[in-house]
Swiss-Prot record:
This is Peptide deformylase-like. NCBIfam families: pept_deformyl (TIGR00079), PRK00150.1-3 (NF001159), PRK12846.1-5 (NF009484). The active site is at residue 134. It comes from Brucella melitensis biotype 1 (strain ATCC 23456 / CCUG 17765 / NCTC 10094 / 16M). It comes from the Bacteria. Signal peptide: none annotated. Coiled coil: none annotated. InterPro entries: Peptide_deformylase, Peptide_deformylase_sf.
């Protein structure tokens, strides 16, 4: 297990769609372990392989350390309810800034586990927000793109100030 270097905004790799995982082997398990260590060190509650510069559709979430991490390979949203919720979001690739983003309140997800077995999961609240946020990242949509232009520009200025 290794803490990897996190790609920082505005690195263009954060806006590129990730490639599907096709090989389910020890290398994938090592990647998932490294993502978990990196996310915990950041600290954060979610991370994707593109956050460490690897173009693979891998997500690790850990909303509650006691419950342990969840690993999603090739996740996709197959259903979303009409109702929307707003929640504070941020990124390990843009530390120190957050803003409110609107997302579906409830979704159904299809993904594979580390052995390649297909799984489905329904989520709501914060977990649904995290699923949508990280799948956006896998699709090359960095979370600030979900903000209005004015809010995005203000947030980027705040982030740039923090980086000085």
């Amino acid at each position: 297990m290794t803490v990897r270097l996190i790609v920082k905004y505005p690195d263009p790799r954060l806006r590129a769609a990730a490639e599907p995982v096709t090989t389910f082997d020890e290398g994938l398990r090592k990647l998932a372990d490294d993502l978990l260590d990196t996310m915990r060190a950041a600290p954060g509650i979610g991370i994707t392989a593109p956050h460490i510069g690897i173009s693979k559709r891998v997500v690790v979430l850990e909303l509650d350390r006691a419950a342990g991490p969840k690993i999603y390979i090739n996740p996709e949203i197959v259903w979303a309810c009409e109702e929307k919720i707003r929640h504070q979001e941020g990124s390990v690739s843009m530390p120190g800034v957050v803003d409110e983003v609107e997302r579906h309140a409830r979704i159904r997800l299809r993904y594979q586990d580390l052995d390649g077995n297909e799984q489905t999961e329904e989520s709501d609240g914060l977990l649904a927000v995290c699923h949508q946020h990280e799948i956006d990242q896998l699709d090359g949509i960095f979370w600030v793109q979900r903000l209005s232009r004015l809010r995005r520009e203000r947030l980027i200025k705040r982030y740039e100030k923090l980086q000085r």
